Structures are given as structure tokens and as C-alpha cells.
Amino acid sequence: MSMQAYELRDDDRRPPINDVLEVVQRGLRLQPKRLPSWLFYDERGSQLFEDICDQPEYYLTRAEIDLLNVHAGDIADVLGEDVRLIEYGSGSAIKTRMLLEQLHSPVSYMPVEISPEPLRQSVQRFSELFPQLAIQPLCADFTRPLRLPIPPRAPRRNVIYFPGSTIGNFEARDAIDLLRKMRNEMGEGGGILIGVDLKKDPAVIEAAYNDKAGVTAEFTLNMLVRLNREIGSDFDLSAFRHRAHYNPMAGRIETHIVSSRYQQVKVGRMHVDFGDGEAMQVEYSCKYSLSDFATLAAHAGLKVQHVWLDPQQLFSVQFLVRA
């Protein structure tokens, strides 16, 4: 079945250019300066993230795939029959396929993705792999309230699928808010299937965000490329560098864009000064113990019903239900 059989529905929840400019200017007024990580994900950024997942240092994707190789059938049994799978993100070619192959008579698959082109590619990929599966793509920002399309038949349960470790990119307060939003959207009897990266040797964690090929560095600086293109700023990429280090007290990777000299950047009508060595925070990647994440989920009115681990116990997939 061709992808033309599916309507790429646009929820109009993507930020307009003026909103991007306002967000950037507000973040650059802060001390220290700070920009939101969703700015990474234009089409180039989405592709670079896929490339990051292929780097030898980036254990997260391999660990999650190893986990699914062992446990996908058990996960499908826990989710049960007639599930509507709502994925926050456009769909990993491998991980989502592994899960969909095991699901028992799923009602539909709904990828929610802010970037139109990765979403179209996802629809085409999965419509070819699963020609009998109803696919209902939604182009939207999954951090904001969603208008879910009507499924082709009534599901027994809505399951929000949030693979990878994206929940770790949210600070605790924002992660709780997002989990509460998921709790509302899944409805009574629904669940959340979520990837959670675990605390481990800090050297292993740091290497994953500082690959030798420099793909993560390119991904980080692509944010500035996007801003120059979309809002007409004049960031000089040669004058900034990527930095990511693990903060063991906070249990997270902290990613910054660092100015390599004193400089002034034009952002709209605003002129922003950067000092030599000044760091602008662009992303956190939080790591959890199992008890840490159970506590976080409880604050959102959820409880952990099942936990699956990869063979090396680097990564977890957890199933949450209403407490």
C-alpha cells in the first residue's frame, strides 16, 4: 500500500518563525544563556541524530535493540490485543518495526513528529512493511496537547510509545508535566511504554555524547545553522564548539555550545554579546536508577507495572499505568 493512502495530518502545533525568534531571544537574555533542545530537530538535525545512533560510542540504541530482541514478544503480551500505538517521534526503522511485528492485531499506529519530511519517510517505510496496518501520522509538537485522529475501530487500550531516552532530555519538572500529559492522552486503561537510560560508568556515558567522528558536535552546532536560516541570525559556526560533560551530582549529561572568542551576534533586532569561553546550555540528558524513575512517574500519577532490561543492564524499557 502506498503512502498516498494516508493523510499526513498537520496539527498546526509547530512553532511559527516569529515564535522561534521570540524563544531564542528570551533564552539569550538569560544568565547563563539557554536554548531549548527542540531547536536541534530540523530535517538536517533529525538525520544527524539518526547518524549519532550509528556511532560506536552511542550505546543507547544498541542496548535498546538488544533489549527488544530478547523481550519484544513479552512486551507485546503485556500490552495485549487491539492496541492503538501512539509514538512520540517519527518512528525508528528498527525499534518500532520490532515492536509492531510482535503486537497482537493492533488497531492503528500513530507517529507524532514535528518535522514533516521524517514523518513522511516514516509513513512510507511502515506502510510498506505493514500494508494491513492503519497508519495515522500527525505532524505536531508532542509536548503540546494533541488532537488525536479517530481510529479505524475502537482500541482496547491506547499505548503511548516513547522509545529511545528522550524523556531524559526533560528536567524533572518538565518530565513530570509530559508524563501527566501522556497520562491524560492515553485515557483510562491506557499505558505508556517508555525508554529510560540508566545510571552507569560516567566514562561510558560521556563517550556517547562525544563521539570521535564528531557527529554529535555537528548535530549540536546545526542548531545555529537552523537559526541563521530561519530567523536570520548571524552565528559564525567557526567561533563556537560543542561541549558535553557528565554531572554526577545531577545524574545527567549537560550539553553546551561554547563561544571560542568574544563576539557579538545579531538575532532579529537584538545584539547578543558572547564572552570568550562563555557556554550556552542547549540540552540535558538525564540518567536514572530504577527507583529514581519510579519516583518521577509517581509524581505524574503513574506507577511502573513492568521493567525490561537489556542483557548488559545499560538501558530499560518500562510500562507505566495510572496509579
Name what the model sees in each region.
Residues 82-91:
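Conserved class I S-adenosyl-L-methionine
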Residues 115-116:
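Conserved SAM/SAH-binding beta-strand->alpha-helix loop
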Residues 176-188:
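A short glycine-rich, Lys/Arg-flanked "PGG" loop and its adjoining helix->strand segment in the class I
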Residues 185-199:
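Conserved beta-strand signature within the Rossmann-like core of class I S-adenosyl-L-methionine
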Residues 204-286, 290, 294-300:
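Substrate-binding/catalytic lobe of Class I Rossmann-like enzymes that use SAM or dcSAM, i.e.
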